[in-house]
Amino acid sequence: MHPREQTIFALSSGRPPSAIAVVRASGSQAGTALRKLAGAIPAARTAKRVLLRDSVGEAIDDAVILWFPAPASATGEDIAEFHVHGSRAVVNALIAALSSIDDARAAEPGEFTRRAFENGKIDLTEAEGLDDLIHADTDRQRRQALRQLQGLLGDRARGWRKELIDASALIEAGIDFADEEDVPEDLARPALEKIAQLRREIEQTLAASARGERLRDGLTVAIAGPPNAGKSTLLNRLARREAAIVSPHAGTTRDIIEVYLDLDGYPVTLIDTAGIRETDDPVEQEGVRRARDRVAKADLVLWLSDDHGGEPDQTIRSGETSLWLIRNKIDLAGPENDGAKPGRFETKAGQSAPPWRFRISASRGDGVDDLVSALTAFAEKLLGSSEAGVITRLRHRNILRDAVASLAKAETLAGRGDELVAEELRIAIHLMGRLLGRVDIDDILDSLFKEFCIGK
């Protein structure tokens, strides 16, 4: 039997031990599994308490079972669910009993979702939304992923595809029945009006695409500066834990340290880098090289210095990354800090602005709240709200850009031959099929479903 035709099973809940464990089976032998382990198939969608037994009659557990017959199930196949006590021993015994059933095997990662897709229960954009939901770290990411899973982009793409098919039908009718007297003379005009409208709608969706993609991926903020400027101390203060080793000796941090922050629902990866300076130490040189590399790729650089100086060099200043200069250690005595208030620096009338944007004490926390508020506002400006993201992946953007190009070409070809316009519409319709996962997507499926956990 082909693997796609076999019944699959897996633990679908969290890893044991737990209060309850859910083991799910999907496929033609799901009903057989219920009969062999529980004695009978219960009424559809009705929970039933039973004593599960293995093939030799040994009791496995006092469990609750459910039956979801095809096609009205999550995968479109027969599904059996076993809700058992969540010990490793119980789960292992149940998995072993299911393994003894003919044509049943353990599921691969994402295989339940793949079968749901292949049986038309979800489209590819919804499967991608489920993947994003599983991997969501913040509430804004969760809301965006849930909207995708519920068909936000898929419904829109299906609507566009239908409109394109309608426009194509008008063009094709004009070609096929050009000599018929009862066919209107200019069927292309309403078709071209529809094409122009669709192109504008897709362009508007693309215009907001960057925010959806960036919210999914999150922002990267690098803490950089000279050695012993307090970078690791600031990282620990923002992370609210001891993520990096702090030492009074310069050059303690040699490698990149990353921590994750949730700033009001915005995902931020915070990076602590090695102190940037000239050095003869080959290990420290590698740390400085890596620091410069991550600084160049970050969305924002927090450059820390103290009253001993340490301004960023021209390479860092001239980069495309946003740069905030921060004066740290204001709790220490020094002419630069006399009378200085922590937080964002406000320039008074007639006063020249200093090179730094914030004054803080990372060790005491002075001014850090203002810095966090500014970071949150920065993230909000770049990422927007979760409701803005219709396009959340580069795949979506590339396909829709190609569709816009085909529609624009169809408009320019108007008057040169309806056959040329019809061909561009066929390309655009095909692209909508790719977006929904109905054509030319085997390589995409293999990559996507491998990201899912086993049992999903």
Swiss-Prot record:
Binding site for GTP: 228-233, 247-253, 272-275
Gene name of the encoded protein: mnmE
Gene3D superfamilies linked to this entry: P-loop containing nucleotide triphosphate hydrolases, Probable tRNA modification gtpase trme, domain 1, tRNA modification GTPase MnmE domain 2
EC number: 3.6.-.-
Bound cofactor: record note: Binds 1 potassium ion per subunit.
Record keyword Chaperone present: no
The protein's name: tRNA modification GTPase MnmE
UniProt function note: Exhibits a very high intrinsic GTPase hydrolysis rate. Involved in the addition of a carboxymethylaminomethyl (cmnm) group at the wobble position (U34) of certain tRNAs, forming tRNA-cmnm(5)s(2)U34.
